[in-house]
């Protein structure tokens, strides 16, 4: 339960750096407020035994400001803030958030895209991995106080879930589910 919410000034952050860009475009001086942030990885996890897509549900304060709930459904994901390859970071996030130990060579890159283009312009790289119970080493849930809930969505319900506006979800999840449904035969037959 979320309570005792208050807004305070952000004097310093390890995750964001607010900036104002000045530039000339067509001989006009313009300014744009933006936030420098880390890039990220996201992983679409397909549970081959249960025929489900694994997502995480967690509290996101900015979403709370909009809907007074704040819980979002997202792909397993993490920021790129370590001196490791993107696939190594994806590997760590799968283990930490969802509890599966997936061999690096079984985590396949799908594509990358820009997110939050109006204020951040970070790049998210999407991966896909098949998992099964033999790979499960923990219940997941994140590290420390992340309070991540692991949820499985049946493949049959994926399209309806994607379009359900009552559940806050990220564009990365929506794109990932759409990509999976378009490429289901290839992913499930590997």
Enumerate the language-model features and the residues they cover.
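Nudix hydrolase/Nudix homology domain
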Residues: 1-6, 69-73, 82, 109, ...
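Acidic, metal-coordinating catalytic segment for phosphate/diphosphate chemistry
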Residues: 8-50
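Acidic pyrophosphate-coordinating catalytic loop
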Residues: 10-13, 64, 113-124
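Active-site-adjacent beta-strand/loop module that shapes the phosphate/pyrophosphate-binding cleft
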Residues: 17-28, 116-136
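Short loop segments at secondary-structure junctions
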Residues: 26, 47-50, 59, 130-134, ...
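Internal catalytic-core helix/loop-beta-alpha segment
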Residues: 81-113
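Short conserved catalytic/interaction loops centered on acidic-Pro-aromatic/His motifs
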Residues: 102-110, 117-122, 136-140
